[in-house]
C-alpha cells in the first residue's frame, strides 16, 4: 500500500511528503510564520502607517489581523503601540 501511495505522489513532486522529518519541518516553518513572523510584520506595518492608511489598505490589514489573531495575541502584552502625545505643550 505504501508503494502505491509513493508512486501516486511522484508525478506531483511530493515524494518528500512521506519523510516525517520534512513533514515536521514544514509544520514548524509554517507555524513559525503564522505565530511569529507575520504578526510582527503586521504590528510594524500598523505602527508606521496608522495615520496615512487608505480605506482599502486598512480593510486589508484588519482582515490580516483577524486571520493572524493568535500570533497577535502572543505579542500584544509586550508591544506598546499607543500614539505619542503632543510634545512641548
UniProtKB/Swiss-Prot annotation:
Its EC number is 7.1.1.-. Its main location: membrane. It is found in: Cellular thylakoid membrane. Keywords: Membrane, NAD, NADP, Plastoquinone, Quinone, Thylakoid, Translocase, Transmembrane, Transmembrane helix, Transport. Pfam families: NdhL. It is a multi-pass membrane protein. It catalyses: a plastoquinone + NADH + (n+1) H(+)(in) = a plastoquinol + NAD(+) + n H(+)(out); a plastoquinone + NADPH + (n+1) H(+)(in) = a plastoquinol + NADP(+) + n H(+)(out). InterPro entries: NADH-quinone_OxRdatse_su_L. Signal peptide: none annotated. The chain crosses the membrane at residues 29-46, 59-79. GO terms for cellular component: plasma membrane-derived thylakoid membrane. One of its GO terms (molecular function) is quinone binding. Belongs to the complex I NdhL subunit family. NDH-1 shuttles electrons from an unknown electron donor, via FMN and iron-sulfur (Fe-S) centers, to quinones in the respiratory and/or the photosynthetic chain. The immediate electron acceptor for the enzyme in this species is believed to be plastoquinone. Couples the redox reaction to proton translocation, and thus conserves the redox energy in a proton gradient. Cyanobacterial NDH-1 also plays a role in inorganic carbon-concentration. NDH-1 can be composed of about 15 different subunits; different subcomplexes with different compositions have been identified which probably have different functions. This is NAD(P)H-quinone oxidoreductase subunit L.
